[in-house]
């Protein structure tokens, strides 16, 4: 090859793409993507949709897939996707076997037998060797239940140019695709640093003893020749651990002085927690639902290619056993409405859109026509200001639902706002709460999501492990209300002494700190409980990117005179702020899920 002259310099280049006006552009490094696939019909349509949308030149990507021992349509989905995209990629190597559902020594499809480990080790080693022979620059080992929602993931990992690096992936718990500690006998060791990295308390690329499930290997590193999944290739006498591909690979890196890194300098995507032996497939389906709900919360919708949609069954919808479900949403907020209905589609919720009363459309005359009068002396506890038009519209929206459920004689109604995030296993946990509530009886309202405003521990409802007696709370993110509860809230004629709805409800269950307000309401006999842990949280808090409040940030009223410029103290706490409770209280009120300390054998999702 002749030297290339560039601005008076002689440079010998390999892989030059083009020279334009003295500048030289290089082709992107070659990447081999390796995936071992078994019984992933439920994840593959999403796995492929997000993989296809990676913004990295496809003619610089080769695909290497293997699949066997399936009990579902995994092979059909792989074939369908490859039929459409193969020509886009540099090369495709797909091998599969249509053999028995289980190996002879497997007890179930989630059992990691000796033969299964041997097959995975053999195939991964074959793929690594293939990458070397084809002169790939990088090999990306990618599990089929990893959803790379960040389209720049591959480009980012390549640009880091590290020997071994994994993008940190999130799950519906504390599980991720890296370890921060490993014991002398090769087991997971919990460390404080793990949560610091997982929770983005520190960001960057950090050396760790173990990465798995999505691992980029730089083949250009000289020492990478020593990397192996096969313990027979390790230095004699060094390794005495289990026959496990990810452990062996990590130790081969260790023996070769090749550091492994986890990267959390970007948000990359999600991973499902591997099933343990004996776990039913339904558990994985629930995990996938949780993950899709997370993705919708972050991105608004799920990426699913048109030709893969027929592989995804529609989720049947129901009302979870209650009379009706309403979702309050301003008609001028279609993006929130669409996001919520995307959630409902994934969760299987039959929900009616209830158009919210828009504070922007309210006027002094309209309020007089409705019969609205304000509680004498009311001022927001933090801003010391009257109600905003948005808060009035919010109250009226809830009020009209209470009226409607009484008119239609609806026994139990779930009321949802449009800025909520569903907790994992939402429907299953709602069923548990409903079972307890109906068995115990006597309730009027049950918070599913709220902001607690008292430090004192709330007492458990006698006979329940899912319900507490509600203390003073903000927010009406979501609550279950009985017909009797709706009647109680209406009979007090709240429009004649209006306060925000999330002040009115605590007043009515007689747990409000402002006695001067409370004394205006006589029948404070609402029985209010709360789900514990909570089932709903806000999508955003004050100060978060994307935080919008249609109640706090609207015009306020002052004896029916609009004040268009709210000059209240911006440093005061807003209702959109997170709870500021003691750490003990927070621990008691949230799901505590440690890292899934699964056996090494079950930290798997490949063949």
UniProtKB/Swiss-Prot annotation:
Keywords: Endoplasmic reticulum, Glycoprotein, Glycosyltransferase, Signal, Transferase
Glycosylation sites: 226, 254, 514, 565
Composition skew (Basic and acidic residues), residue ranges: 571-581, 591-607
Signal peptide segment: 1-22
Pfam family, one: Glyco_transf_25
PANTHER family associated with the record: GLYCOSYLTRANSFERASE 25 FAMILY MEMBER (PTHR10730:SF53), PROCOLLAGEN-LYSINE,2-OXOGLUTARATE 5-DIOXYGENASE/GLYCOSYLTRANSFERASE 25 FAMILY MEMBER (PTHR10730)
UniProt record similarity statement: Belongs to the glycosyltransferase 25 family.
Compartmental location: Endoplasmic reticulum lumen
Name of the protein this chain belongs to: Glycosyltransferase 25 family member
Primary enzyme class: transferase
GO terms, molecular function: procollagen galactosyltransferase activity
Motif, Prevents secretion from ER: chain positions: 604-607
EC number: 2.-.-.-
GO cellular component: endoplasmic reticulum lumen
UniProt xrefs under InterPro entries: Collagen_mod_GT25 (IPR050757), Glyco_trans_25 (IPR002654), Nucleotide-diphossugar_trans (IPR029044)
Listed SUPFAM superfamilies: Nucleotide-diphospho-sugar transferases
Segments of this protein annotated with the region Disordered: 566-607
